[in-house]
Amino acid sequence: MKKIFQFIGLFVLICFSFFYTEKAITVLNEQDPIMVEIENKKDYYYLKPIDATIKYNTIIPGIRGKEVNINKTYDNMKKIGFFNEKNIIYDDIKPSISLCDNYDKYIIRGNSIKNGIALLFIIKEDKYLDNLIKIAKDKDITVNLFITTDYLNNNISKLYKFTNTEIYNFAREGIYQKDLIILGNNIINRNAKNRSSYCLTKEMFTDTLNICSKNKMHTIYPSKIINSNFYSNIKSDITKGDIILLELTNNMLEELNTIIDFIKKKGINIIGLNELLNE
């Protein structure tokens, strides 16, 4: 019995020793000039998150905020011996209203803070595809290809060659069913550089929204759908955050270089959906 009490006493002593040591280290850290400066400046580097905008059955993504991770930043700066803002380590702050929690809404545009737009194209055959990819590469932009599952299934070996693109599932020409979603997504996720995260609809079909939502995919309803007079339509009305679906035709390709140059001159980036819609 005596040995048991001795063991318990030793255990309590060790626990107290650890607690006291940790407390002492915490006090010393709090008095360190580096820690003091981090505490004093953390509010300056705080970035408030912006909530997604929901109106009826539509959504515009928000923007994540960030805050200084005090302990990780302190450990990082302690290695160099002084405060340096380049060594600050941040934690993301998810918006209270977030795209990630709302699969049952149509994404109608990106957040204008991103200073970008997305160009979308539907692909169901090879026609014009090589020319489109060449223009995207030459102009150093990213285009978003919504590809039918038939084309995906018959052209798997080509996908890795699609530079300057993001690839998404267009199922059976926009008709989404569970088996087509699984097939198309598996092909894309295994062979493309991006994950298959989005469905595309030209009209607000509840069936599309429901089945894509059940499969944890967001549904995009473009800000603009342009089938003719491509340059004129874009020139007359373009804003940051636009998601523009362009019909892939010979006339469109003839105007695409001019369209890209016009958008760039306005200081707007032409980017992938992943970047435009990521909070």
Where are these regions (language model features)?
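Terminal accessory/targeting
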Residues: 1-119, 134-143, 239-279
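A generic local structural motif
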Residues: 105-106, 230-233
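Metal-dependent polysaccharide deacetylase catalytic core of the NodB/CE4 family, i.e.
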Residues: 117, 126-231, 240-243
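S-adenosylmethionine/decaboxylated-SAM
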Residues: 236
